[in-house]
Amino acid sequence: MIFLIGNSTSNYTVCFPIFILEDTRALKFPYSMLQALEFVLTFVSFYYVIKCCYVAIHIKSFHRNLTVLLIILMIQWFEGLLSNILIKPYETGFWPLGEHNTQLKQWWTKDYSKMIQVPNLSTFPNFFLGGFLKWHYILSMITTLLVMSIERSFACYFLTDYEKKSRNGLFFMLVVGQTSTNLVMGYLFFFNAAHFAVGFSIILSTNIIAMGIFTYVKHVNRQVNRAIEDFSNPSLYCLPARFQVRENVRCFQMITKVIHAGLFLILTACFVNLFMYLELTPGLDPLLNLIFESAINLNPVVIVPTLLGSVNAWRNFTFSSGVCLGFKAQVRLKIIKVSSVSIGNDGAKSDRTRKETDAYFDQLNSAWI
C-alpha cells in the first residue's frame, strides 16, 4: 500500500506491506471470529517460539553459531508481533486513519491520485513505526536462509576444527551484516526508494544466491562424507571431520524441510493476495487478508514444528522432559560432588596411613641399625 506524505508542493511516498485498511467488517460477526482465531494462534506461536529457543539452548545439536542464529530468528518474531499490534487497530478500522472513514484497498500504484494521503508521519507515529518494523521483520525472514547458507559453507570449509572453535568473528560478521543490510533495505522499501520490480528482484536474487550456496555446500559435504565412509582420503578421516560432516547432514535435512514449509507459506500468501488484487471474491476479503497476514505474523505455527520435527534430538522434547533432565542433571552433579568429597576424604586417610607406615618403618630401620 502506497501513502503520499505531505502536500501538493512538498511530498514523498511510503510503502506498506499491507493490502487493506479500515475494514470494519473484521470487527463484526462472523468475521470477528477470525480475529479471535488470530488471537489464539498468536499465543500458539508464542509457545512455539519459546519452546524452540528452549530446546536449541538445552539440547546441543549444532555448532553454537548456527544455534544462536536460530534463536535470533525466533526472537525476531516478537518484532513482527509488535508491528501487528501497532497496525491492527487501523487495519480493522477501530482507529481511523485521519479523515478516511471508508475501506482503503490498494497494493501498488504510481498514480498520485490513487495514493492514500497523510499530512505527516508524526500524525500517526505508531502506525508508521509498525510499518517499518514489519518491513524489517519480513526482510529478516527472507535473508535468514542466505545467512545460514554462509555459516554452513564455513562449517564445510573448516571441516576438521570448526566444532572445536567458537568462530566469534564469523558470528558477529553474519549478525552485523544481516542486521545492517536489513535496516538499509527496510529504509529503502519503506520510503519507496526502490521500485516494486527492483525490490522484488532483490528479494528473489537473495534467495537464489542462498539456494545456490546451499546446494553447492550440500554437494561438497556429500562428497566428503562419501570419502570418509570409503576411506578414500585418509587425511579427512578424523573424528572432528566425521562429526562435522554428520552435523552438516542434519542441518541440511532441517533447512530443506524448513524451506518447503516456507515455500508453502509464501505461495499461500501470494495466492490469496492475487485473489484480493483481482477482486475475485471481495466478500471474502477479511478472510483472505487474515490468511495473508497469518502467513507473515503467525509463521511459527508452521515453521517451528517443522524445524523441531526435522532433528531427532529435538523431536520428542517437551518442557516436562526438559525439567526432568534439569533435575536429573542437578542430582547427578550433587552425586559427583559427594563422590569427590568422599574420594578426597579417602585420599586424605590414605595419605595419613601412608605417612604413619613410613614413620613406622623408619623407626624400625633405625632400631635395626
Swiss-Prot record:
Major subcellular site: membrane
Subcellular location: Membrane
Highest taxon listed in the record's lineage: Eukaryota
Transmembrane segments: 1-21, 39-59, 67-87, 127-147, 169-191, 195-217, 258-278, 291-311
Record membrane topology: Multi-pass membrane protein
Keywords from the named record: Membrane, Transmembrane, Transmembrane helix
Pfam families: Sre
Record has Phosphoprotein as a keyword: no
BP-aspect Gene Ontology terms: sensory perception of chemical stimulus
This protein's GO CC annotations: membrane
Stated family: Belongs to the nematode receptor-like protein sre family.
Protein name: Serpentine receptor class epsilon-45
Native species: Caenorhabditis elegans
Gene expressing this chain: sre-45
